[in-house]
Amino acid sequence: MAATAAYLPLRAQAQVGLAPLRPSGSAAAGARLPGRTARRRLAARGGPEAAGIRAEAVPGGGGVARRAAMVPPYNVLITGSTKGIGYALAKEFLKAGDNVVICSRSAERVESAVTDLKKEFGEQHVWGIVCDVREGKDVKALVDFARDKMKYIDIWINNAGSNAYSYKPLVETSDEALMEVITTNTLGLMICCREAINMMRNQPRGGHIFNIDGAGSDGRPTPRFAAYGATKRSVVHLTKSLQAELQMNEVNNVMVHNLSPGMVTTDLLMSGATTKQAKFFINILAEPANVVADYLVPNIRAIPTNQSMKPTYIRFLTGLKAYSRIFSRIAFGARRNKYVAED
């Protein structure tokens, strides 16, 4: 969070679960966003392009001689997507006309989420399955399920994460809570990336993987949830390492990116709204999941639309936006008590 050091009080961002903020002129490295009319026309085309495939020769590719360029509608898989930002992302992709597979550890939440989404977007565009990302067999089954329903996965978003809903010093944290956080956020992420790459590298159209960051991913301390911050620091490192491995192995049709939703008013964030300082920054900087997803999804979709295979870090809460909100609060009292009572 290099851009926030000048204005955030000591440890403030860690206390509220704030992800890294950096000024950015364009969240998707200048990617152009396709208009809705253009997307509808692409989706309505016949032949191979209706399925999102347009043949394009590329060199190398780790044994893949040709890469089929992606066009909308896209096939999307999101882990941890029955509530919060994951569910909101699923809705936005469906609004754009894409096909989506959601998953969760809870069979009840999967059933409920799929039922609600099918009512709104139709039976043929969304599916769900129970999956514990900590279990390799579950993630392999998830891939098989997605392949059966959609044939390809164009966009895989690793959103599943946990802080065990525990905000306390490490010395007071139980073994069970530590295992919950580390196995979900680190082991689970690695398993998902492994299976996503193995599938996508053998697809004619390749694919894009997005790893969601969180507080601690920039290396700043996260007191009271040190384990969570340590796992999120590893997200950025893992993404860079996978990018390097793909390049070394001449896999030209798969790319791994980072995705930063900033502060989202989910159960995960709000469970930490226990101090005056935490409440202050949540009110100033946080946004509901649907607002964040409405911004992120077009920027995510712009990457395959522009046939880009460059690594991208998409951020919702930039440094400039944070500066502006903090100034408005100090000068005009804006957003006081917006989500939680401060007085």
From Swiss-Prot:
Pfam families: adh_short. Its EC number is 1.1.1.294. NAD(+) binds at residues 78-102. Induction: Up-regulated by dark treatment. GO terms for cellular component: chloroplast thylakoid membrane. Interacts with NCY1 to form a complex that acts as a chlorophyll b reductase. Required for chlorophyll b degradation. This is Chlorophyll(ide) b reductase NOL, chloroplastic. It comes from Oryza sativa subsp. japonica (Rice). The lineage of its organism: Eukaryota, Viridiplantae, Streptophyta, Embryophyta, Tracheophyta.
